[in-house]
């Protein structure tokens, strides 16, 4: 910084702060401005030039205690965050400052959180399957390595637990590096995740970045960019395949909406910011694979009032390769993960990519579940006895498939008391194929609930049968 550009605060409206640079050079849009007051550092990002040498900024920290007249210094650059191997196994805030009480890091390189997306020439498309070990995903909504994956669901249907299971399954199997960006979610969840990563031994290959729901909208709006910047460096310089987990992308949109209102912009549909599509595009287009390496992103997306047509989830939909929809009605049946196999989709569900056997099994499972859904009204009104023999057989088989799509999670062991299962893709295809062929029509429906492979369902049914026989003998 050759010469310090000093301004003065002239207005404070919550997280929006107006700063006058009278007689000085006006800071550029996105520049990071700093203020040190009573041993606390405050950072502001320039959002607008409003005339009369005044800039309107968004504070990255709470503005409590600030007053007009305080001097602010222009750093001459956007927010710069540390990158490189030094950030692994550490926890950061939106500004790249450590928050894990392990002291500061000695990073050799810093990067701006604002960057352009890779050009068309640099990008690289991949059709390689990313095996998750979760039956319903691997069979019906296969994920691609280097793809963008969305987990859509309302409040309390299991998005965060599913993200944590994916971290556990993919990060432990996957040899590359992982970045987790906690955007506007509960601090408790971040703390749980941190300790789970320590326990599972993946922390040394992971970077955590948090801007939780108690923080100002500026921090929540930018924290995803901080995490993405660190992931991009691993991809471009280390030439690594990187996993980027974002929980929750809706909070990024929500924070942008708050900031937009505070900046005085006219709201668009349902009160969202008029720049919603632009902001989402700027973030999502940077999450891509290049010839150097890949970024595979898993993004939890909160769906307000379970309405998938809401502008926030609807705008996110357009950027994704796989859409995994979590349904409250399935959760109400006690089936977890509560993934809707009919509403979810993936571009990878193609016989040229996944092979003919996998494709035909997945298609048949979807067809049976679709027919079962159509028969629900008839069953509710007339009863199952009024169905044809063929439809009765289909309904019983569909219920077994529905139950078999459930799975015990490793990260939920302490809640469920059931040991988590990782099911290889070949085993998943074999198991569902046998159910479709009617080989297990004689097994009770509840034998298919919360098991891994079909062999476990057979063992469970035997155990139930033996227990029933023993009870009858005792009686």
Swiss-Prot record:
Chain ranges passing through the membrane:
none
* Swiss-Prot/TrEMBL catalytic activity: ATP + H2O + 4 H(+)(in) = ADP + phosphate + 5 H(+)(out)
- For this UniProt record, give its keywords in alphabetical order, as a comma-separated list: ATP synthesis, ATP-binding, Cell membrane, CF(1), Hydrogen ion transport, Ion transport, Membrane, Nucleotide-binding, Translocase, Transport
InterPro entries, sorted: AAA+_ATPase, ATP-synt_VA_C, ATP_synth_F1_bsu, ATPase_a/bsu_AS, ATPase_alpha/beta_chains, ATPase_F1/V1/A1_a/bsu_N, ATPase_F1/V1/A1_a/bsu_N_sf, ATPase_F1/V1/A1_a/bsu_nucl-bd
The record ties this protein, via PROSITE patterns, to: ATPASE_ALPHA_BETA
Give its localization.
Cell membrane
Membrane topology per record: Peripheral membrane protein
SUPFAM superfamilies, per database record: C-terminal domain of alpha and beta subunits of F1 ATP synthase, N-terminal domain of alpha and beta subunits of F1 ATP synthase, P-loop containing nucleoside triphosphate hydrolases
Provide the Gene Ontology terms for cellular component: plasma membrane; proton-transporting ATP synthase complex
Q: Which enzyme type, at the first EC level?
A: translocase
Q: What Pfam families does its record include?
A: ATP-synt_ab (PF00006), ATP-synt_ab_N (PF02874), ATP-synt_VA_C (PF22919)
Q: Where does ATP bind?
A: 153-160
The protein's matches in SMART domains, at most eight in alphabetical order, are given as: AAA
Q: Name one GO molecular function term.
A: ATP hydrolysis activity
Family of the protein in this entry: Belongs to the ATPase alpha/beta chains family.
Q: Report the PANTHER family cross-referenced here.
A: ATP SYNTHASE, ATP SYNTHASE SUBUNIT BETA, MITOCHONDRIAL
Oligomeric state and interaction partners are given as: F-type ATPases have 2 components, CF(1) - the catalytic core - and CF(0) - the membrane proton channel. CF(1) has five subunits: alpha(3), beta(3), gamma(1), delta(1), epsilon(1). CF(0) has three main subunits: a(1), b(2) and c(9-12). The alpha and beta chains form an alternating ring which encloses part of the gamma chain. CF(1) is attached to CF(0) by a central stalk formed by the gamma and epsilon chains, while a peripheral stalk is formed by the delta and b chains.
* Reported function: Produces ATP from ADP in the presence of a proton gradient across the membrane. The catalytic sites are hosted primarily by the beta subunits.
Protein name in the entry: ATP synthase subunit beta 1
- Taxonomic source organism: Mycoplasmopsis pulmonis (strain UAB CTIP)
